[in-house]
Design a protein with these regions (language model features):
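Membrane-interface helix-loop junction between the first two transmembrane segments
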Residues: 31-42
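Membrane-interfacial segments
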Residues: 39, 71, 102-105, 141-147
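Juxtamembrane loop segments immediately following a transmembrane helix
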Residues: 93-115
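Individual transmembrane alpha-helices with interfacial aromatic-anchor signatures
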Residues: 109-127
Length: 156
Protein backbone atom coordinates (compact mmCIF):
# COMPACT_ATOMS: atom_id res chain seq x y z
CA UNK A 1 0.00 0.00 0.00
CA UNK A 2 1.62 3.19 -1.16
CA UNK A 3 0.71 6.83 -0.86
CA UNK A 4 -1.14 6.58 -4.18
CA UNK A 5 -3.54 4.04 -2.68
CA UNK A 6 -4.74 6.41 0.06
CA UNK A 7 -7.99 8.26 -0.47
CA UNK A 8 -7.61 12.00 -0.98
CA UNK A 9 -9.98 12.61 1.94
CA UNK A 10 -7.68 10.67 4.29
CA UNK A 11 -4.68 12.69 3.14
CA UNK A 12 -6.57 15.97 3.66
CA UNK A 13 -7.82 14.94 7.11
CA UNK A 14 -4.34 13.75 8.09
CA UNK A 15 -2.80 17.04 6.94
CA UNK A 16 -5.32 19.09 8.92
CA UNK A 17 -4.77 16.97 12.01
CA UNK A 18 -0.99 17.14 11.62
CA UNK A 19 -1.18 20.93 11.84
CA UNK A 20 -3.63 20.69 14.73
CA UNK A 21 -1.20 18.35 16.49
CA UNK A 22 1.64 20.85 16.00
CA UNK A 23 -0.52 23.71 17.32
CA UNK A 24 -1.58 21.61 20.33
CA UNK A 25 2.04 20.86 21.21
CA UNK A 26 2.89 24.54 20.76
CA UNK A 27 0.10 25.49 23.14
CA UNK A 28 1.26 22.96 25.71
CA UNK A 29 4.77 24.41 25.49
CA UNK A 30 3.71 28.05 25.68
CA UNK A 31 1.41 27.65 28.68
CA UNK A 32 3.37 24.83 30.29
CA UNK A 33 6.36 27.13 30.64
CA UNK A 34 4.46 29.34 33.09
CA UNK A 35 3.11 26.33 34.97
CA UNK A 36 6.62 24.91 35.29
CA UNK A 37 8.02 28.23 36.51
CA UNK A 38 5.22 28.61 39.07
CA UNK A 39 5.78 25.06 40.29
CA UNK A 40 9.53 25.64 40.56
CA UNK A 41 8.95 28.75 42.69
CA UNK A 42 6.44 26.96 44.91
CA UNK A 43 3.50 29.08 43.71
CA UNK A 44 0.07 27.78 42.85
CA UNK A 45 -0.83 26.74 39.32
CA UNK A 46 -3.42 29.11 37.88
CA UNK A 47 -6.47 27.23 36.63
CA UNK A 48 -6.50 29.19 33.36
CA UNK A 49 -3.06 27.90 32.44
CA UNK A 50 -3.97 24.37 33.54
CA UNK A 51 -7.08 24.58 31.33
CA UNK A 52 -4.90 25.62 28.38
CA UNK A 53 -2.54 22.68 28.86
CA UNK A 54 -5.47 20.25 29.28
CA UNK A 55 -7.15 21.49 26.08
CA UNK A 56 -3.84 21.20 24.22
CA UNK A 57 -3.30 17.69 25.59
CA UNK A 58 -6.81 16.51 24.68
CA UNK A 59 -6.34 17.91 21.19
CA UNK A 60 -2.95 16.24 20.76
CA UNK A 61 -4.29 12.85 21.87
CA UNK A 62 -7.28 13.26 19.54
CA UNK A 63 -4.98 14.01 16.62
CA UNK A 64 -2.85 10.95 17.37
CA UNK A 65 -5.99 8.79 17.38
CA UNK A 66 -7.13 10.34 14.10
CA UNK A 67 -3.82 9.35 12.48
CA UNK A 68 -4.99 5.72 12.68
CA UNK A 69 -6.52 5.20 9.22
CA UNK A 70 -9.80 3.50 10.12
CA UNK A 71 -10.81 5.74 13.05
CA UNK A 72 -12.14 8.61 10.96
CA UNK A 73 -14.08 6.24 8.71
CA UNK A 74 -15.59 4.08 11.46
CA UNK A 75 -16.46 6.83 13.95
CA UNK A 76 -18.63 8.73 11.45
CA UNK A 77 -20.77 11.46 12.96
CA UNK A 78 -19.08 11.13 16.36
CA UNK A 79 -15.91 12.63 14.87
CA UNK A 80 -17.78 15.78 13.84
CA UNK A 81 -19.37 16.12 17.29
CA UNK A 82 -16.03 15.64 19.08
CA UNK A 83 -14.31 18.10 16.73
CA UNK A 84 -17.02 20.65 17.49
CA UNK A 85 -16.53 20.14 21.24
CA UNK A 86 -12.81 20.77 20.76
CA UNK A 87 -13.63 23.90 18.73
CA UNK A 88 -15.73 25.22 21.63
CA UNK A 89 -12.93 24.46 24.12
CA UNK A 90 -10.39 26.31 21.94
CA UNK A 91 -12.71 29.31 21.47
CA UNK A 92 -13.17 29.50 25.24
CA UNK A 93 -9.40 29.37 25.66
CA UNK A 94 -8.96 32.14 23.09
CA UNK A 95 -11.62 34.23 24.85
CA UNK A 96 -10.05 33.89 28.29
CA UNK A 97 -6.50 34.70 27.22
CA UNK A 98 -7.51 37.13 24.50
CA UNK A 99 -9.27 39.28 27.09
CA UNK A 100 -6.15 39.17 29.25
CA UNK A 101 -3.43 39.75 26.64
CA UNK A 102 -4.62 41.17 23.29
CA UNK A 103 -4.68 44.78 24.49
CA UNK A 104 -1.78 44.32 26.92
CA UNK A 105 1.38 46.33 26.16
CA UNK A 106 4.39 44.00 26.37
CA UNK A 107 6.89 46.81 27.13
CA UNK A 108 9.80 44.44 26.51
CA UNK A 109 8.44 41.74 28.83
CA UNK A 110 9.19 38.40 27.18
CA UNK A 111 6.48 36.59 29.13
CA UNK A 112 3.76 38.96 27.94
CA UNK A 113 5.03 38.74 24.35
CA UNK A 114 4.93 34.95 24.57
CA UNK A 115 1.37 35.01 25.89
CA UNK A 116 0.27 37.46 23.20
CA UNK A 117 1.62 35.00 20.63
CA UNK A 118 -0.08 32.12 22.44
CA UNK A 119 -3.45 33.85 22.04
CA UNK A 120 -3.08 33.80 18.25
CA UNK A 121 -2.02 30.16 18.33
CA UNK A 122 -5.25 29.50 20.26
CA UNK A 123 -7.30 31.28 17.62
CA UNK A 124 -5.59 29.40 14.80
CA UNK A 125 -6.29 26.11 16.58
CA UNK A 126 -9.93 27.02 17.13
CA UNK A 127 -10.45 27.94 13.49
CA UNK A 128 -8.70 24.81 12.28
CA UNK A 129 -10.90 22.68 14.57
CA UNK A 130 -13.93 24.42 13.05
CA UNK A 131 -12.67 23.55 9.56
CA UNK A 132 -12.08 19.96 10.69
CA UNK A 133 -15.64 19.85 12.08
CA UNK A 134 -17.15 21.07 8.83
CA UNK A 135 -15.00 18.66 6.82
CA UNK A 136 -16.03 15.73 9.03
CA UNK A 137 -19.69 16.70 8.66
CA UNK A 138 -19.28 16.90 4.90
CA UNK A 139 -17.54 13.54 4.78
CA UNK A 140 -20.23 11.95 6.95
CA UNK A 141 -23.03 13.48 4.87
CA UNK A 142 -21.53 12.23 1.62
CA UNK A 143 -20.71 8.72 2.85
CA UNK A 144 -23.68 7.97 5.11
CA UNK A 145 -25.78 4.93 4.29
CA UNK A 146 -29.06 6.39 3.09
CA UNK A 147 -31.40 3.48 2.50
CA UNK A 148 -35.16 3.74 2.37
CA UNK A 149 -36.95 3.81 5.69
CA UNK A 150 -39.56 1.22 4.76
CA UNK A 151 -37.68 -1.80 3.45
CA UNK A 152 -34.08 -0.81 4.01
CA UNK A 153 -33.11 -2.22 0.62
CA UNK A 154 -33.25 0.70 -1.77
CA UNK A 155 -30.66 3.45 -1.78
CA UNK A 156 -32.29 6.86 -1.76
Amino acid sequence: MGIKDLAISYVVFSTIHFFLFALALTTIGLYGTDLHNANKQGKYSDSKWVYAVVVGSISAVTCVLYFIPFVLRVAGFVVAIWDFILFVLWIALFGVFGKMYINEDAEGDGGVKRMKNAVWVDLASALLWLIATLAALGYWWKHRDNRSKFTGRAHV
